Amino acid sequence: MEINKDNIANWLMQLQDSICSALEKADGKSKFLEEKWERAEGGGGRTRVMKDGAVIEKGGVNFSAVHGKTPEFLLRDKEHSSADKNASEFFATGVSIVIHPNSPMVPIIHMNIRYFEMTGGVKWLGGG
């Protein structure tokens, strides 16, 4: 697979599908409901929410891929000093997950993975 923003976004959509499928199977009762959305400045995403399950009280697995004009604060940020100060465009995509189980003995899950790039070649992959 060539590493480019479109392939990364497609892989992250597949990751969202895979995670939702596995959680539905593990829960056995509830299913994710999906709402698609668009960002006026460019891009959009899919919000998926599950609630009142056998194991999961409420959870969300969300995907986004947005683009537009690079915010000025990123162009001024010293951490990104290698960025082209005239970089006018950015692209960002990611998946975020928040799961609240029914049992207080089971930990809450909160994680995300994201990819960001700006015109001029600055790009990074992160998560937490």
Please identify what each model-predicted range represents:
Residues M1-S82:
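Gly/Pro-rich turn-and-neighbor structural signature
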Residues T47-L125:
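Internal mixed beta-strand/loop scaffold within catalytic domains of large alpha/beta enzymes
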Residues G128:
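Flexible glycine-rich active-site/ligand-binding loops centered on an Asp-His dyad
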